[in-house]
Every structure is written in structure tokens, then in C-alpha cells.
Amino acid sequence: MRFIHALLLAGIAHSAYASEKLTFKTDLEKLEREKAAQIGVAIVDPQGEIVAGHRMAQRFAMCSTFKFPLAALVFERIDSGTERGDRKLSYGPDMIVEWSPATERFLASGHMTVLEAAQAAVQLSDNGATNLLLREIGGPAAMTQYFRKIGDSVSRLDRKEPEMNDNTPGDLRDTTTPIAMARTVAKVLYGGALTSTSTHTIERWLIGNQTGDATLRAGFPKDWVVGEKTGTCANGGRNDIGFFKAQERDYAVAVYTTAPKLSAVERDELVASVGQVITQLILSTDK
């Protein structure tokens, strides 16, 4: 009798979970219709197992979300002893491109340290600092090699900033899929890709990111621990990737959207709305 009772409870729980995932999908499809948008979402656990998703295998332009795995690559080099965080990277005015606030600020001194550039790339989305790091690691191809090294066979970087933000429909360059990037986030933060010290530092940077207050973070409950890296592209691209801790459970998340008919503010609101849909799913399945 107890066995039958247990089976019934398991069946009810499975049915409820399936219902919540259907609601998740339905809510995202509704947002897509209302906003004339395409929305890609992947949520995975620390082992990279899928929790939920939508358009998970569809390619989207990475935009500046790649700056998080770029920073991870920099930390890997530091961890292995092939790089020093305090090494000064010299540069001149030619390194100043659109949206380079920290690079401009340090220009008078003629250099930034490796860690200063990495932090600026993550927390400010500084394009000059990003290109400076790309110069040091060996260019976009080296970034793609790092993706492959940590098990991501999909994500690719082909150009530097700002050219990589073209987001031309059908162009495979500088793209990823939500599931590939979510698993990359999980690998970096939970999979032992970095030392504990480097992992802690990059988590702290993501939590202190200064470009994401209006995106996923705005759609999540205030008591969740959230760290993320945003991205913005031409043709309506607005993205956010990172991690969150909800009810003592850790998750990696990747959200990629294309909404060319929306304003910049409306695209932020769209990503925040996706955050609300994710919240509803997580709270309902963690009961």
C-alpha cells in the first residue's frame, strides 16, 4: 500500500512539474508574439543538466556576453602561471573604441593591468579593455579554442569589438546557443574550470556588474543572489547570462533575445519579463 501511495505522489509531482514547464513555454511564446521577438532561454543546474529552456539550440549573437568567458580564460591563464594579474598592458589611443570608459580613464597612464582590464570588460562591458585582452590571448580564435577546451562545441568568436555586434540574420559568426552558453557558465562557476580563488573573484564581479540592473536582475526576487553579464547587439539583440541562487539551489542561466521593433528600454524590459517567467518556474518547482 505504501508503495502504491509513493507511486501516486511521484506521479502527482511529475504531473505538476510538467504543467509548470508547459506554463513556462506558453508564457515565453506569449512574450514572443506580443513583442515580435525571438527568445532563447536555457537554465541548467551546476552539473549542466537542463532545468528548463526555450529555443535552446537556436543560434543567437553573443554580443558582450562573451566577455564573461573571456574573463574566465584570463583567470585560467593566471591560475596556470602563464599570466600575471598585475602585469601592465600598454596601449595607445587606437585602443579606444565605442564604449570604453575604463580604457579612456587609464589612457593617460598608457596602461591597465590584466585584472583591471578583465574587471572592466565584465562589470562595465568596456570594449577597449576587451580588445586589449583579446590582443594578449591571441585574438578571437583563441577565445573559440577556449570554448572548445571547456566542452563548448558551439560558441564561436570571429571578430573583436565592435564589429562582432553586427548581428546579421543568418551569420554564424560570433554566435552561441542558450544551452551551450548556460553550460559554459556552469562549467566555469561550478565545474572546476578555475581555482576557487579565481572562481570567487569572477562571481563577485558578476554580482557587482554595473550594466544589468534593468535586465534579468530586475525580474528576479530581491533575496536571490544574482550575478550576470549583459550583451547588446545591432538588430535588436539584448542578452543576459550568469547565475542565480534560489532557495539554496544554484543555477546557471542564459537568455538571448532578438526584438528589432523594440526600443532599448523595451528590450531591457523584455529580458526582465523573461526573468519573471523564470522566477515563476523556479518557485513553483522548488516547493
Swiss-Prot record:
Keyword vocabulary terms for this entry: Antibiotic resistance, Disulfide bond, Hydrolase, Signal
Effect in UniProt of substituting N165S: Increases catalytic efficiency about 5-fold with respect to benzylpenicillin. Increases catalytic efficiency about 50-fold with respect to cefalotin. Facilitates hydrolysis of cefoxitin, which is undetectable in wild-type
Signal peptide: 1-18
Cysteines paired by S-S bonds: C63-C233
One Pfam family, short name: Beta-lactamase2
SUPFAM superfamilies, per the entry: beta-lactamase/transpeptidase-like
Induction: Expression may be regulated by promoter elements associated with upstream probable integrase gene Intl.
One term of GO molecular function: beta-lactamase activity
Domain of life per record: Bacteria
Effect the entry attributes to changing E98K: Increases catalytic efficiency about 65-fold, with respect to ceftazidime. Increases catalytic efficiency about 8-fold, with respect to cefotaxime
Cited InterPro entries: Beta-lactam/transpept-like, Beta-lactam_cat, Beta-lactam_class-A
Enzyme Commission identifier(s): 3.5.2.6
Activity regulation, short description: Inhibited by the beta-lactamase-blocking agents clavulanic acid, sulbactam and tazobactam.
A biological process from GO: response to antibiotic
Reactions listed under catalytic activity: a beta-lactam + H2O = a substituted beta-amino acid
Residues that bind a beta-lactam: K67, S125, E161
UniProt key word Signal: yes
Active site, per annotation: S64 (nucleophile)
Other remarks in the entry: The class A beta-lactamase family has a specific amino-acid numbering system, sometimes called Ambler or ABL numbering and often misspelt as Amber. A multiple sequence alignment was used to derive a consensus sequence and then the consensus was numbered taking into account insertions and deletions. This allows use of identical numbers, e.g. for active site residues, despite differences in protein length. UniProt always uses natural numbering of residues, hence there appear to be differences in numbering between this entry and some papers.
Family assignment from sequence similarity: Belongs to the class-A beta-lactamase family.
Stored PANTHER family: BETA-LACTAMASE (PTHR35333), BETA-LACTAMASE-TYPE TRANSPEPTIDASE FOLD CONTAINING PROTEIN (PTHR35333:SF3)
Function: Extended-spectrum beta-lactamase (ESBL) which confers resistance to penicillins, as well as first, third and fourth-generation cephalosporins. Has modest carbapenem-hydrolyzing activity. Has cefotaxime-hydrolyzing activity.
Protein name: Beta-lactamase GES-2
